[in-house]
Amino acid sequence: MEFVFYACSLIAVISTLLVIIQKNAVYSLLYLIISLLSISGIFFIFGAFFAGALEVVIYAGAIIVLFVFVIMMLNLGKKNDLQEKKYLNPIFWIGPSFLSLILFLLMTYAIFFVKDKQIYFSLIDVKEVGINLFGPYLLLVELSSLLLLSALVVVFHIGKEKK
């Protein structure tokens, strides 16, 4: 299990560095998704399954979608469209794909072949997730929802065209 931990940590560090280095915002978001998924893998390794699942759902899901909306609202014009055609070249998407493949293989190895700390699946329903979130963490959930709402309002205000 140590090998999986170090591999997930290495992928998290590499992809986070690529988030900082990358000049295009969309590819930076791809590397950010890989970084967040590898961090959730580390949560799963340490046995914090709920925190790992929340990492995937909240950060890699909702917040990344919000970032994509910001990029879409910027609307960089025809120059950006020509540059996006250039980005269809495999050299631009091979890096995120390779890191995602390594992360997928590591998680598959950890789930099926590591016997001493194997991840066991258990189904929980939405009611249990709601009770766990809105029980002791009600204030944190409400504050984070207000933060996301205010970020959405700011993005809308910045992205709105002036007439």
Curated annotation (Swiss-Prot):
Membrane keyword on record: yes
Q: Which reaction does it catalyse?
A: a quinone + NADH + 5 H(+)(in) = a quinol + NAD(+) + 4 H(+)(out)
Q: What is its EC number?
A: 7.1.1.-
What residues form the membrane-spanning segments? 1-21, 30-50, 54-74, 94-114, 138-158
Its Gene Ontology molecular function terms? NADH dehydrogenase (ubiquinone) activity; quinone binding
Membrane topology according to the record: Multi-pass membrane protein
Superkingdom field: Bacteria
Give the subcellular location.
Cell membrane
Listed Pfam families:
Oxidored_q3
Major enzyme class: translocase
Q: Name one GO cellular component term.
A: plasma membrane
Assigned keywords, A-Z: Cell membrane, Membrane, NAD, Quinone, Translocase, Transmembrane, Transmembrane helix
Subunit info? Composed of 13 different subunits. Subunits NuoA, H, J, K, L, M, N constitute the membrane sector of the complex.
What is this protein's function? NDH-1 shuttles electrons from NADH, via FMN and iron-sulfur (Fe-S) centers, to quinones in the respiratory chain. Couples the redox reaction to proton translocation (for every two electrons transferred, four hydrogen ions are translocated across the cytoplasmic membrane), and thus conserves the redox energy in a proton gradient.
Among PANTHER family, the record links this protein to: NADH-UBIQUINONE OXIDOREDUCTASE CHAIN 6 (PTHR33269:SF17)
Family, according to the entry, reads as follows: Belongs to the complex I subunit 6 family.
This chain belongs to which protein, by name? Answer: NADH-quinone oxidoreductase subunit J
The organism named in the record is: Buchnera aphidicola subsp. Schizaphis graminum (strain Sg)
Its lineage opens with: Bacteria, Pseudomonadati, Pseudomonadota, Gammaproteobacteria, Enterobacterales
